[in-house]
């Protein structure tokens, strides 16, 4: 952690909805004139898409694991080094993993490839990370200790799988069977490297549907905001001072389910993020 060069990380699995949280932060940054250095966690993947497909197929034949959730498929040491350097000096590096044709056009690179490393822009107010491992802790790596504000985005597991399958079908052209196989191959690393992070976060945002999602592998319909609630658990009340009474007034239809948890209609999730996180971010910057 660093008062001079604060780091904010949004962490969540594939299909969790971290991009929605990112959009909320981008709005806060623009509205308050904050200049962030931005890092997409996919840039720390160890291999490009073709190489990953080839090596993961080989690993499967050998009975070993290679996934984007675990250490074999990522540069965890590089991730921690970047966070450490930014916290000390306000500098670091990043690159881009090219997911689709739009990104390919923007970065003049083929889909599924990794661009070259480039230095972060200078004189930024904070570092913002969005990805899979913003709160990672292993026997050798401790990313979480460098983070000043750690946000978890973790819908209930059936909904997460539904969103993952839907995205892979729409963007990557996978079949439901392909996407399901990928989920299964990642399960060990999901349990050991993804879910433990949510016990270290300052806030967790968990989307909960109110319709039947019992079999996520048999439906392509994603529950709408009107069919969902978001559970906001403030895990660190010492760091994040929340006026829950004010939130209940501002967020129509919300309820308190426990002394540190508020449940809001899913359509108000981004607004809730803005109400809760704006003063926290301002405090981080005021302490610089």
What do these predicted ranges mean?
Residues 113-122, 143, 157-288:
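C-terminal accessory "lid"/substrate-recognition subdomains
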Residues 16-17:
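Conserved glycine(s) of the Walker
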Residues 136-141:
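Conserved ATPase-coupling elements of RecA-like P-loop NTPase cores
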Residues 2-8, 124:
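Pre-Walker A (Motif I) flank of P-loop NTPase domains
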Residues 12-13:
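P-loop (Walker A) phosphate-binding loop of NTP-binding proteins
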Residues 20-21, 25:
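Hydrophobic positions on the alpha1 helix immediately C-terminal to the Walker A/P-loop
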Residues 34-40, 44-103:
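Conserved nucleotide-sensing/catalytic segment adjacent to the nucleotide-binding pocket
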């Amino acid at each position: 952690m660093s008062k001079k060069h604060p780091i904010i990380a949004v962490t969540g699995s594939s299909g969790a909805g971290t991009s929605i949280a990112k959009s909320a932060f981008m709005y806060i940054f623009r509205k308050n004139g904050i200049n962030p250095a931005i890092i997409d966690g996919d840039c720390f993947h160890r291999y490009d898409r073709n190489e990953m497909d080839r090596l993961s197929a080989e690993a499967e034949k050998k009975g070993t694991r290679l996934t984007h959730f675990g250490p074999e498929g990522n540069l965890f040491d590089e991730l921690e080094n970047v966070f450490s350097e930014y916290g000390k000096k306000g500098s670091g590096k990043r690159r881009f993993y090219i997911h689709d044709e739009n990104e390919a056009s923007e970065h003049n690179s083929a889909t599924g490839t990794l661009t070259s490393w480039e230095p972060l822009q200078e004189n930024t107010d904070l570092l913002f990370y969005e990805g899979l491992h913003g709160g990672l802790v292993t026997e050798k790596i401790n990313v979480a200790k460098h983070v000043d504000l750690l946000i978890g985005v973790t819908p209930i597991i059936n909904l997460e799988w539904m969103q993952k399958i839907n995205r892979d079908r729409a963007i990557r052209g996978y079949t439901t069977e392909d996407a399901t196989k990928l989920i299964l191959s990642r399960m060990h690393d999901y349990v050991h490297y993804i879910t433990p992070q949510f016990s270290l976060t300052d806030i967790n945002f968990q989307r909960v549907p109110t319709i039947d999602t019992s079999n996520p592998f048999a439906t392509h319909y994603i529950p709408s905001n009107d069919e969902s609630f978001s559970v906001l658990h403030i895990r660190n009340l010492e760091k994040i001072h929340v006026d829950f009474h004010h939130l209940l007034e501002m967020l129509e239809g919300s309820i308190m389910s426990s002394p540190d948890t508020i449940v809001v209609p899913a359509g108000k999730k981004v607004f809730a993020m803005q109400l809760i996180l704006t003063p926290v971010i301002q405090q981080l910057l005021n302490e610089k």
